[in-house]
Structure formats: C-alpha cells, structure tokens
Amino acid sequence: LQFAHFSDLHYAPDNLAESDRCFGFAVSNAIDRGAAVGVISGDSTDHRLDAHAPSLNALATQVHRLSNAMPVLMLQGTFSHEPPGTLDNFALMGGTHQIFVADRVSQVALIDGRFWASTGPVFSNDELRQFIDVQPEVVFTCLPTVNKGQLAASVGALEAGTGLGDVLAAFLAAAGRVNRQLRASGIRTVGVSHGTVNGCTTEHGVVMAGFDHEFSLTALFEAECDAFMLGHIHKEQQWERDGRLVAYPGSIGRFHYGEEGDKGYLTWDVEPGSATATLVATPSRQMICVDFDGPPDMARLEEIAATAGDKFVRVRWQIDEEHRQVVDREAIKAMFSGAADLKVEARILPVVRSRAQGISLETTVEGKLARWCDLASVDAAPLQERLQLLALGAEAIAAGVLERLNAQAHSPSLAVVLPHPAATAPAGESEGAVADHPAGTSAPATLDWLNDDLFAA
C-alpha cells in the first residue's frame, strides 16, 4: 500500500509562495503516483491564521484536492504553529474521501476508505474483535503533540520537564502490544507523531541530544509499527530496524537560510512487517549563504552576484566596532538587485581593552601609574613628575613654566662657548689677516657659522 507523507507545510502570509508552490507540486505528484493514503504529520500552518487569510484558503484548497484522490489523515502539530482547534474545520473539507483530524492520543483504523478511531488511547479487545476480521487497509497509532501544561498538572512540573519521554514510551509500549496482534493478522500498522527524536539532526546540521526530547528510537520501534511517520524536524532522515522504518520527510519547502539537503515529501510502500520510503524533492527555494570572518570581500560578492539570478541570498560578516563604517551596504544591495531577496547581517565586535594586570592591587595613583609603566615598558620618571604637577594650582604650574623660560634666556650663546678659531690664532697671523682687507672696508665682527650667510657674495 502506497502512502504520501507530508509534514511541516507552515502555511502563513510570509511563507505562502513557498508553501503553496511546494505543497501543490507534492499533491500533484502523489496523485500521479497513485498513492492510496495521504498523511500530514503536523504543523500545516506556521501560526494562528484568520478565517479570511489567503494562506488558510490556499492550504484548504490543496488539502481538499488531495482528499478528492485519497483519504487524508491530519495530525495536530506544535501548539505555537497550530493552535488547538485550527484543524477542526479541515474535517469538514473532505472531497471524494474523508479527512480525519487526529488531535488526541488514539488508534485509528482505515476500513473501506473510512476512518474509525478507538475510544481510548488504544483499541480495546472488544473493538479489535469488531473489525479485525474485516481486514482494515491500515491501523494508525496517532500521537499528536502533547500538552506539557496538562502533563505538569498531573505529574508535577519537575517530572514533566524530563519525564515526558517516559510517559510517551509507556504509551508506545502499550500500543505495541496491540500492533503485534494486528501484524499477526496481516494488517499494516503505521505510527504518526510530531516531535523530536533524541539523536536526530536538524536542518542546520545540529544533533539534538538531551533529556527533554519526546522520543528515543528504542521507544518508537517498541510501538511495533511497520512504518513510523514523524514530523517537526525539517531535515529528511530515516532509521531502519528489522525491515521496519522510522522517518522524517522534513519540511515541504525551504523556509530558513542555511537549511541543508533537499526538501520534499516521502512516498511510502508499507506491508505487514516491512516498509520503505523515498524522498520526492519539491521545487523549493534556492538559497545562497555567504559568511565572512572580517569585512566582506567585494570581489567575491561580485562573482556570486553574477550567478545569483532569482535566488535568495544572505550575506553575513563580522567586523570590529571601530571599522564598521568601511562596509558599503548600499553597494552590496546594488550588486544583488536581481536576486529574489537579499538579507545582510553584520555582527559588530565591541572593542575590548584589558586592564593592566595587578593594577587594582595598588592603593595609590602613583603606584598604579608605576605599575602601568612597568607593564607597558614606559619610563616612569617624566610621568610621575607630571602627575605631581596635578597637585599644584594653575598659577603655580604657570610660574614654573615661566621660570624655566627665563633660565633659558640667560644661558650663554653658542658663539661664546665655542669661539671661532680666529680668536686663538697667533699675533702675526692676525695682523696679516687684517692687512689683507682693503681700505674703507671692515671685516665682519665674527664668522659665526650658525648665524652668518655662508653663501653670501
């Protein structure tokens, strides 16, 4: 029996184009492949939608189109995405076939195209006797999102935080006892749920490991389902054990930057004791993510922009606070004007200045200054002298400056300290030198090489 498994459609005004293009393609493809049953495993909407919202109308149109070709089971997803009651109206939108909304923990049998739900969490022995001889096409074990508030009210807040997995594992084990009977009778068994498997990988490549996740693989396989169809994680992944399969189809489209892998839906072939699943890719958005450790490389961005076309582009960089103005955002926007969308993100690194080690241990300003000079390899004497000036008044500082200027004015000139060689010449040489001068002219008083023009005629 062939199943079409969709999940995480996330219809909303912002996602409408992506969601409807991808889900519309998936519905058409599933119908063309001849799928017998459709399963939507949660998060059909991204948040609360008004009745007149175009995104809700588009979702209803596609689900109705799917129900004209096959029975459809819709599971309650995350409450923040699908507020309780959101899916109730979809049960009234069936076409040729029925749409069943699984919003409580239960088992559901599909008999001649009609869904029959258990009274309690699992089928009782009396209920099994009523239909087991009829040979249902499939029996679903439905485990929608659990309200942790209700769980906390019954078992306590502390236990609800880490004990949710144990509570769900107990239910899956109970369902497994029923599913073993069904498999022994040749009836297909399929689990449908919405949550996180411990150890799975998100669409951004992060491994989900912790104590507060809903499921473990051991608990899921203990449900004894031939196929277990999951939702919530946006990355397609599968786990197999003894021919039985647990799988996420991932989100129907690409809603965030940095998501890894193809987007699509799973087409399942399920028989008692075995199952296979194949991803059918949808025409999701093409996104380009460019990250720089420093300022963006404009030459590289030009190369990327040349092939960006109608893609969605995100450019991120990090830069220190003092150089944030060197990045021309407008130039980057102009480069990618032909792209479908551009998102620029700058991470500004604050300038961090570390204090001198041990400076806080000094009790005086003089000591702190000496400590800083020691660490910075700076001569401390001039700085200490100027620090002492701060204790004086402005008039005292000005008087000290004037006193130094006056002392410099009375210092002997360089000509006196270093007399010209002619002053120490012998007497004869001095007289000859005077006779050489023509009459009526006078020799310069001194040949001071610091003051006279040496190149005068």
How would you label these PLM feature ranges?
Residues 8, 23, 43, 59, ...:
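Divalent metal-coordination and catalytic microenvironments
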Residues 106-137, 244-316:
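Binuclear metal-dependent phosphoesterase catalytic core
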Residues 85, 89-213, 424, 432:
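Conserved catalytic scaffold of divalent metal-dependent phosphoesterases
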Residues 15-112, 124, 217, 221-225:
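Core catalytic region of metal-dependent phosphoesterases/phosphodiesterases
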Residues 1-4:
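Extreme N-terminal starter segment of soluble prokaryotic enzymes
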Residues 12-14, 46-49, 75-87, 108-111, ...:
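Active-site environment of divalent metal-dependent phosphoester hydrolases
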Residues 270-457:
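Accessory, non-catalytic peripheral segments of nucleic-acid enzymes
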Residues 92-97, 197-272:
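Conserved beta-sheet core of the metallophosphoesterase superfamily
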